């Protein structure tokens, strides 16, 4: 080992000698590289190579060069830039920079940068200048300006030099904000001046916008200023309420309440107070109040005025307008709430009989006297309901609806019980025949006027439902249907009776509310009267219904017999069509009359009085056994001959205990003459060409044949053909021409020239056709004899 060291010393001496000698005696570059490599290999030398490997330097010298770079850059050097400048690897620079920062407390390594105290003092001076200029500064602004960490700036720069280089103070609520004392004084002066100038509640945001002060400084300085007012909160929507405004609010509320005895919540809301009830309690602690929906009302005012007046009204037959004794500012809703608040209290329970309507209170005796005439109306309406049969139908519907709710699991029991009920009805029917043949309750029927001599209108009630009737009593599984209440007394009738009395008092606008108030009571009185009359005269009404139906059926049968006599004069093929038309019209009407009568006898309710064949067959299946077969057979006879239909009808009448009147030929002639007269009257009243031709043909047929005919418009040609031989050529030509023009009008377009021309020609012939039908005499016709 010693020999090696001696050899090294010798080489070093040679190296030094070579450097001091002339060029011819220096070592070559290769020898130098070998010598350095050997020293590095023996770890006797520590050097740092440059990035290109052509140069090397010792760590100590590199450290001095880094410090020189730090000084050259003004106390702040980026290690990346130093690495580029010294041409040394960045890792070696970072390692040495860390050692420099550890060994020298005046130098800091921050985010890849070396910073010394001189630079920190320099930026502290800059911060002080900026703070003096702006009055307030934050660490975040400094961090973005100097590109340094905020914690380093706060602790190593600002706080370290605060009060020395940096003349200012730190915000106690936000340590990252610093400001000068002069700035604080300016802000205080601005805030104090703004708050002193405000006379009404103002948003803090508006104040800050005007004085250009930050919100956090405003709230931190507010307690130091101690303004004559208060801030509602520290939120963004906070308001400043000056003391003078709060005092004015309090004085206004107390003054208004003292003068009026009440105060509206809306008025307090307009003052900027969000909880009016709490504010009223705070401002009027000694007052006893009624807190209503819209107002607070003084209890003493109500006791002295309203309660006294209500007691007086209750004791007399009078009414009281509350709006005349309560403050005029109160609405109708407020007055109603006051009344209900008073009458619902236990102390004023004796006032519960009073009736309130639209601001006016009525005593019960006053209303009883007012409504007394309506009681007579109710009794009259009850009697009318019995006379018209409305109440009887209502009783039937109500009974069926109550029975129709039986459960489907009781179907067998109901079916087993039906024969007993039917036997009972048969017994009642047997007893009823002695008194005229009526068996069931009365139901509304059509008028007894004859067809084409004033037929009744269609039935009053109709329903689109296929099930137009409902079995009363034991229909198992049927749904329970509610019956609409029967209103015998109408609101309009009650108003008409009480209106004159109320009009004299100037309160006629309450006529309808009072009528609605007593309408149910009056209807109950009317129903009670109807029930009384119904129970008193059931048999009489049933006999009248039975007789009415019997007369109606006989009238229709006479019509059919007379029409049959007339249609037999026409050709055989036309006769068949006319028979079918006759049965579909008058025959169908007879079937309906009898089906409805039987339905009432069997306690069935029928919603639609205008029944078709299927509905009548379905209804027949619901009837008692004694009616079922004859009704079905009568329905089938509508598609047969007139004789078959008459026989089937006689069977139904026999079961219903009705009789058919004998033929009276003298009366037949009167009926034919009456029928012709009515046709002539209709002819004079009509202006429709087709109807005029139809009526004229029927009148001429009756005049010529002495018979009446039931035919629709499509049979006009056949009728004209029949009467042709009884007319002269001119009369035939007139009717044929009029007939052709009618066909032309019906076939042509209404707006066409052809149609208009035909109309004009018809107008010219109309009077002649009417005159022919009116004045034609059978005596002048040889064929008629």
From Swiss-Prot:
Which stretches does the entry tag as region Disordered?
A: 404-483
Question: What is its EC class?
Answer: transferase
Gene Ontology CC: one annotated term: endoplasmic reticulum membrane
The record's GO molecular-function terms, alphabetically, read: UFM1 ligase activity
Specify the superkingdom: Eukaryota
Q: What is its EC number?
A: 2.3.2.-
Pfam families linked:
E3_UFM1_ligase (PF09743), UFL1 (PF23659), UFL1_C (PF25041)
Question: What is the scientific name of the source organism?
Answer: Drosophila willistoni
Any one Gene Ontology BP term? regulation of proteasomal ubiquitin-dependent protein catabolic process
Asked if Transferase is a keyword of the record, the answer is: yes
Q: Which UniProt keywords apply?
A: Transferase, Ubl conjugation pathway
Q: What is this protein called?
A: E3 UFM1-protein ligase 1 homolog
Q: What does this protein do?
A: E3 UFM1-protein ligase that mediates ufmylation of target proteins.
InterPro entries per UniProt: Ufl1 (IPR018611), Ufl1-like_C (IPR056761), Ufl1_dom (IPR056580), Ufl1_N (IPR056579)
Family, per entry = Belongs to the UFL1 family.
């Amino acid at each position: 080992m010693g020999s090696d060291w001696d050899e090294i010393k010798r080489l070093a001496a040679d190296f030094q000698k070579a450097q001091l000698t002339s060029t011819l005696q220096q070592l070559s570059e290769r020898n130098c590289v070998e010598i350095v490599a050997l020293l590095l290999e023996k770890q006797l030398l520590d050097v740092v190579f440059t990035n290109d490997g052509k140069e090397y330097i010792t760590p100590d010298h590199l450290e001095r060069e880094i410090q020189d770079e730090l000084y050259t850059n003004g106390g702040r050097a980026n290690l990346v830039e130093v690495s580029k400048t010294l041409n040394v690897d960045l890792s070696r620079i970072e390692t040495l920079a860390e050692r420099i920062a550890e060994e020298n407390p005046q130098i800091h390594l921050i985010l890849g940068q070396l910073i010394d105290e001189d630079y920190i003092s320099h930026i502290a001076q800059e911060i002080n200048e900026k703070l003096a200029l702006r009055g307030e500064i934050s660490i975040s602004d400094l961090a973005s300006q100097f590109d340094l960490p905020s914690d380093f700036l706060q602790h190593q720069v600002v706080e370290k030099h605060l009060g020395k280089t940096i003349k200012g103070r730190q915000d106690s609520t936000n340590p990252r904000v610093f400001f000068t004392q002069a700035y604080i004084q300016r802000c205080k002066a601005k805030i104090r001046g703004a708050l002193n100038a405000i006379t009404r509640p103002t948003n803090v945001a508006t104040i800050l916008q005007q004085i250009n002060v930050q919100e956090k400084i405003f709230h931190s300085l507010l307690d130091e200023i101690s303004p004559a007012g208060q801030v509602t909160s520290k939120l963004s929507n906070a308001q400043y309420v000056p003391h003078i405004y709060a005092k004015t609010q309090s004085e206004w509320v107390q003054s208004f309440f003292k003068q009026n005895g009440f105060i509206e919540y809306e008025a307090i809301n307009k003052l900027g107070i969000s909880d009016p009830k709490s504010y009223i309690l705070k401002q009027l602690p000694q007052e006893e109040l009624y807190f209503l929906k819209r107002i607070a009302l003084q209890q003493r005012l109500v006791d002295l005025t309203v309660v006294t007046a209500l007691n007086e009204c209750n004791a007399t037959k009078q009414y009281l307008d509350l709006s005349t004794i309560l403050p005029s500012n109160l609405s109708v809703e407020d007055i109603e709430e006051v009344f209900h608040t008073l009458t619902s209290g236990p102390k004023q329970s004796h006032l519960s009989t009073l009736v309130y309507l639209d601001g006016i209170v009525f005593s019960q005796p006053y209303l009883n006297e007012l409504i007394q005439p309506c009681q007579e109306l109710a009794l009259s309406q009850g009697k009318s309901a019995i006379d018209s049969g409305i109440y009887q139908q209502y009783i039937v519907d109500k009974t069926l609806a109550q029975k129709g709710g039986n459960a489907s699991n009781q179907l067998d029991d109901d079916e087993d019980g039906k024969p007993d009920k039917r036997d009972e009805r048969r017994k009642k029917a047997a007893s009823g025949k002695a008194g005229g043949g009526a068996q069931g309750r009365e139901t509304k029927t059509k008028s007894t006027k004859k067809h084409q001599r004033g037929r009744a209108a269609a039935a009053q009630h109709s329903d689109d439902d296929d099930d137009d009737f409902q079995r009363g009593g034991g229909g198992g599984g049927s749904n329970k249907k509610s019956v609409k209440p029967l209103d015998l007394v109408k609101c309009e009738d009650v108003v008409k009776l009480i209106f004159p009395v109320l009009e004299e008092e100037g309160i006629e606008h309450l006529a309808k509310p009072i009528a609605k108030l007593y309408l149910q009571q009056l209807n109950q009185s009317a129903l009670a009267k109807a029930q009384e009359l119904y129970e008193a005269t059931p048999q009489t009404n049933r006999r009248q219904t039975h007789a009415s139906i019997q007369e109606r059926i006989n009238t229709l049968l006479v019509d059919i017999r007379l029409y049959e006599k007339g249609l037999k004069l026409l050709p055989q093929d036309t006769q068949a069509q006319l028979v079918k038309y006759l049965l579909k019209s008058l025959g169908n009407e007879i079937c309906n009359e009898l089906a409805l009568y039987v339905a009432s006898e069997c306690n069935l309710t029928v919603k639609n009085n205008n029944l078709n064949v299927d509905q009548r067959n379905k209804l027949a299946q619901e009837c008692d056994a004694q009616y079922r077969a004859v009704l079905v057979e009568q329905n089938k006879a509508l598609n047969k001959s007139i004789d078959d239909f008459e026989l089937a009808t006689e069977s139904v009448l026999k079961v219903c205990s009705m009789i058919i009147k004998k033929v009276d030929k003298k009366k037949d002639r009167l009926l034919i003459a009456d029928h012709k007269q009515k046709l002539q009257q209709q002819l004079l009243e009509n202006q429709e060409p087709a109807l005029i031709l139809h009526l004229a043909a029927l009148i001429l047929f009756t005049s010529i044949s002495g018979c009446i005919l039931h035919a629709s418009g499509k049979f006009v040609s056949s009728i004209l053909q029949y009467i042709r031989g009884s007319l002269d050529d001119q009369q035939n030509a007139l009717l044929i021409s009029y007939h052709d023009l009618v066909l032309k009008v019906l076939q042509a377009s209404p707006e066409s020239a052809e149609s208009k021309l035909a109309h004009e020609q018809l107008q010219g012939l109309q009077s002649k056709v009417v005159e022919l039908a009116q004045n034609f005499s059978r005596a002048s016709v040889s064929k008629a004899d």
